[in-house]
């Protein structure tokens, strides 16, 4: 099982993770199953966790440690679709793992804040974007950010799995 090899390597490099090894494996399995089933990951947090959300999405939507080139079939389709740009697109595009940071979308966020309830903006986005089989990842330094917790409630009601990252003491 290659997953266990990676987990052992991770915990040997970062011994503090040994205490949450089972949680790390469970989070990995949730994400793996989401992507295997054609789902997407939606991520949110506040302040520094907002920046973390955007960063994680950036790594998922393009290659990270390894480049993820498009398939030969898609490269051929690009070249057929646009003789001028297809070759360049095929060489530059990378296979992404579908992910959305719920922390952007300024128009929606400010409209919902003004018209409804700003603490529920992540919940509203999950309700609109999410489907059963997707994953919501909530990031919080305290572990009890109310806007993230509203989103967790919507996720649970919608059959969206949740992964929580508490980044604090």
Locate each region found by the language model.
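Generic N-terminal amphipathic, Lys/Arg-enriched alpha-helix
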Residues: 1-19
């Amino acid at each position: 099982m290659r997953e266990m090899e990676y987990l052992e390597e991770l915990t040997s490099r970062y011994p503090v993770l040994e205490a949450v090894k089972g949680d790390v494996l469970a989070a990995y399995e949730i994400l793996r199953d989401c992507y295997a089933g054609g789902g997407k990951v939606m991520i949110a947090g506040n302040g520094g966790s907002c920046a973390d959300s955007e960063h994680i999405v950036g790594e998922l939507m393009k290659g990270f440690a390894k480049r993820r080139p498009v398939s030969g079939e898609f490269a051929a389709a690009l070249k057929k679709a646009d003789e001028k740009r297809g070759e360049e697109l095929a060489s530059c595009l990378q296979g992404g793992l579908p992910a959305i940071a719920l922390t952007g979308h300024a128009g929606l966020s400010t409209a919902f804040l003004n018209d409804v309830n700003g603490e529920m903006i992540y919940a509203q986005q999950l309700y609109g974007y999410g489907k059963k089989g997707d994953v919501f990842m909530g990031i919080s330094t305290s572990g009890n950010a109310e806007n993230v917790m509203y989103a967790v409630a919507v996720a649970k009601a919608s059959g969206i799995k949740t992964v929580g990252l508490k980044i604090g003491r």
